[in-house]
């Protein structure tokens, strides 16, 4: 685990974005941890979040021309990541996002920001069922652009309804790499360093045994 990944876990714990305990997911599964990126909700939170996303992008080595944030949660992520890349990595890249409903007046269309072209890096909070990615792919392809990759905050590394995860489905269906700031494996490595969190470590390991990919 790299220093920025450990710092991100601590940031998420601090903001109660990441919690350990017993939680029922939308799928009905009982999970020993819960991640709610919506709780990164202040100016400072967003500034820090952008730095973590930018760090993960630079670390990945994936080449891309533009950041795309799917409405709605991807919008502030794309914005703050673009700022962080420019301020901390000297990479001044364009970004854009979609509207849920296309405007029929003013500038019109369903996109806001830069022209959607070239190699697109899609940024979002998490991938649950992959629906937002599929909707975004239709927009990206309609504009003649290509998907360079997807970056999310957390990869739960667990099976969907079948034998593979929603993330593996996206990689298979679109031939692109999905990267994340942290993974379930990183969470376990972090818990292993914390003797006072041993009960959570046992629960997360058991969960990975049952649902992991």
Swiss-Prot record:
GO biological process terms on file: 'de novo' pyrimidine nucleobase biosynthetic process; 'de novo' UMP biosynthetic process; pyrimidine ribonucleoside biosynthetic process
InterPro entries to which the protein is assigned, alphabetical: OPRT (IPR023031), Or_phspho_trans_dom (IPR004467), PRibTrfase_dom (IPR000836), PRTase-like (IPR029057)
Pathway(s) served: Pyrimidine metabolism; UMP biosynthesis via de novo pathway; UMP from orotate: step 1/2
Signal peptide: none
EC number: 2.4.2.10
General function of this protein: Catalyzes the transfer of a ribosyl phosphate group from 5-phosphoribose 1-diphosphate to orotate, leading to the formation of orotidine monophosphate (OMP).
Annotated coiled-coil segments of the chain: none
PANTHER family per UniProt: OROTATE PHOSPHORIBOSYLTRANSFERASE 1-RELATED
GO MF terms held by the record: magnesium ion binding; orotate phosphoribosyltransferase activity
One annotated Gene Ontology cellular component of this protein: cytoplasm
Catalytic activity: orotidine 5'-phosphate + diphosphate = orotate + 5-phospho-alpha-D-ribose 1-diphosphate
Known partners and oligomeric status: Homodimer.
Domain of life per record: Bacteria
Annotated residues for binding of orotate: 34-35, 128, 156
Name of the molecule in the record: Orotate phosphoribosyltransferase
Keywords: Glycosyltransferase, Magnesium, Pyrimidine biosynthesis, Transferase
Family statement drawn from the similarity comment of this UniProt entry: Belongs to the purine/pyrimidine phosphoribosyltransferase family. PyrE subfamily.
Major enzyme class: transferase
Residues annotated for 5-phospho-alpha-D-ribose 1-diphosphate binding in this entry: 26, 72-73, 99-100, 103, 105, 124-132
Organism listed in the record: Salmonella agona (strain SL483)
């Amino acid at each position: 685990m790299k220093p920025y990944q450990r710092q991100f876990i601590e940031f998420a714990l601090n903001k109660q974005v990441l919690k350990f305990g017993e939680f029922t997911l939308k799928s009905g599964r009982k999970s020993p941890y819960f991640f709610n990126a919506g709780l990164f909700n202040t100016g400072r939170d967003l500034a820090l979040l952008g730095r973590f996303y930018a760090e993960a992008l630079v670390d990945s080595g994936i080449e891309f021309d533009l950041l795309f944030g799917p409405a709605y949660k991807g919008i502030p992520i794309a914005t703050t990541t673009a700022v962080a890349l420019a301020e901390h990595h000297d990479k001044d890249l364009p970004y854009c996002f979609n509207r849920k409903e296309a405007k029929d007046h003013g500038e019109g269309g369903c996109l806001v920001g830069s022209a959607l072209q070239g190699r697109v890096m899609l940024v979002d909070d998490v991938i649950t069922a992959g629906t937002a990615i599929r909707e975004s792919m239709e927009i990206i392809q309609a504009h003649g652009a290509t998907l360079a990759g997807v970056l999310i905050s957390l990869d739960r590394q667990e099976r969907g309804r079948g034998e593979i995860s929603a993330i593996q489905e996206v990689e298979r269906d679109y031939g692109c790499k999905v990267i994340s700031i942290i993974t379930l494996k990183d969470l376990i490595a972090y818990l292993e360093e914390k003797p006072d969190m041993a009960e959570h470590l046992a629960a997360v390991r058991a969960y990975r045994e049952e649902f992991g990919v």
